[in-house]
Amino acid sequence: ENLTGGYSGINVIKNVNLTIEPGQAVGLIGLNGAGKSTTIKHLLGLLRMQKGKIILNGVSLTENPAEFKKMVAYIPETPILYPELTLKEHLELVMLTYNLDHDQAWARAKELCKMFRLENKLDWLPINFSKGMKQKVMIVTSFLANADLLVIDEPFTGLDPLAVANFIDLVKEAVADQKMVLMTTHVLAEAQEAVQTFAVLNNGTIETEGSLNEIRQFYGLKPSDSFDRLYQILNQKTVKKHD
């Protein structure tokens, strides 16, 4: 609510208002530099906001950061893994961090690992994984957490078509289970299979929200226009603002 913040006292995002309901996936889209990553970093508590509120299930990030963060799982664009821990140890760390029932969590972990063809790699260290495999590990660990809010940053990078399909199925499953999902992406063709509501972030503010069809209408796109045309229009607006 009215989130304003950035880096070194410079506001990159200004009065951002965004609500995600249980059982809803929202896509945050916009040009590079529009403020998507900055918004996510504030949501994760990695940056201190200048103004506004971030509340999840009645818990304020500012007032109770520890409780807030236990309800959030994050899939970064660039995989972040501990080099000295095996895949199995990463999974066990998630179970410990989120206080999951050990037996139930391991049953779920095995399902997820099989889905992404990692079931025979539990003893592997991150150095043995390709970039795509590291991304799959991040997906597995984040969905294993069973958090109320899943924050996903550009998830399709490095994933093969089967992994993309499996990821989309997991997002749909999470939404059906009344979880909240916030996803940033440029790959709208795939994202629209799992996300019904999109918010366009432009010049640090939410310019419009709605389905992709509603966003097409807002920017005057023709039915025959590709999604690339949306980014061309956003770029033209940004250039005009800075002229």
Predicted regions and their residues:
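Conserved ABC transporter NBD signature motif
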Residues: 52-63, 67-68
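Catalytic Walker B motif of ABC-type/P-loop ATPase nucleotide-binding domains
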Residues: 150-154
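ABC ATPase "signature
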Residues: 209-210
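Helix N-cap at the start of a conserved alpha-helix in ABC-type nucleotide-binding domains
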Residues: 161-163
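Conserved ABC ATPase "signature" region
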Residues: 92, 96, 104-121
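Conserved ABC ATPase signature
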Residues: 125-132
